[in-house]
Amino acid sequence: MLGDLFTKPKKRKYATIPSDGTKADVPEGIMTKCPECKKIMYTKELQKNLMVCNYCGFHHPIGATARIDMLVDEGSFEELDANLTTANPLGFENYMDRIEKDKQKSGLNEAIVTGHATIDGNPLVIAVMDSRFRMASMGSVVGEKILRGVEEADKTNKPFVIFTASGGARMQEGMLSLMQMAKTSAAFKRFSNHGGLVITVMTHPTTGGVSASFASLGDYNFAEPGALIGFAGRRVIEQTVREELPEDFQTAEFLLKHGQLDDCISRLDLKNKLSFILKIHVKTPEAGGESDGE
């Protein structure tokens, strides 16, 4: 009996009764976490705010189709050259497999969408790059679609507005990719010589050969807040010049501060800004005139 005082008491066993109020898993896509401020918000609320964080103003990346839908007048967009696709000109191994995966992921045939549209009744030719497709790298088809878009704007006396987002030249197409820098820049110059209006809007990220060519050749050069814009990477530049670069180097705000941009515009204000500029430069029949150049 005395020994019972020092024996280890037996653990009681309890039955586990499942609760009807057990927390259910949140379906994927219902909530979105901001990579900048780490706040979590309803995806639908974020979409209503044009994918701009309600807390910190971070601009989430968006696809070409979504951007066109939020900018142009409903039903006004008519796509150009939708069937142009890459044909692997250099026979790069596994290149076409990657292209097919990006087609399925993005729903696009290439990394850029071009077409006719109107913004508040103002006609334009619009081009939007989509980073979901090969990081919107510029290959032969991207360069060709930009060229054709500019030529269409020239032929129809419309402004050309392009949204850039790119990792640079497409390495799988080698020299054919690099020549698109000169090809697109020359097209912009010809259009400018004919009195055409070009507006570029640089979004995150605009780098490499795209930033070094047509992206900065607009009559108006704008950017979204926080966009990374530059040619070479930060570490490469620091190792080359042997200097520590500013914290905000290669951001839209840094470029604006140093006179390389005309303005840094929130996505929430962009449509009104573009509409205002187009009204200044374009005469519409509704306004009692004809398009410039006619």
Swiss-Prot record:
One of its GO terms (biological process) is fatty acid biosynthetic process. Pathway: Lipid metabolism; malonyl-CoA biosynthesis; malonyl-CoA from acetyl-CoA: step 1/1. Zn(2+) binds at residues 34, 37, 53, 56. Pfam families: Carboxyl_trans (PF01039), Zn_ribbon_ACC (PF17848). It is found in: Cytoplasm. Keywords: ATP-binding, Cytoplasm, Fatty acid biosynthesis, Fatty acid metabolism, Lipid biosynthesis, Lipid metabolism, Metal-binding, Nucleotide-binding, Transferase, Zinc, Zinc-finger. Binds 1 zinc ion per subunit. PANTHER family: ACETYL-COENZYME A CARBOXYLASE CARBOXYL TRANSFERASE SUBUNIT BETA, CHLOROPLASTIC. Acetyl-CoA carboxylase is a heterohexamer composed of biotin carboxyl carrier protein (AccB), biotin carboxylase (AccC) and two subunits each of ACCase subunit alpha (AccA) and ACCase subunit beta (AccD). Belongs to the AccD/PCCB family. Component of the acetyl coenzyme A carboxylase (ACC) complex. Biotin carboxylase (BC) catalyzes the carboxylation of biotin on its carrier protein (BCCP) and then the CO(2) group is transferred by the transcarboxylase to acetyl-CoA to form malonyl-CoA. This is Acetyl-coenzyme A carboxylase carboxyl transferase subunit beta. It comes from Listeria innocua serovar 6a (strain ATCC BAA-680 / CLIP 11262).
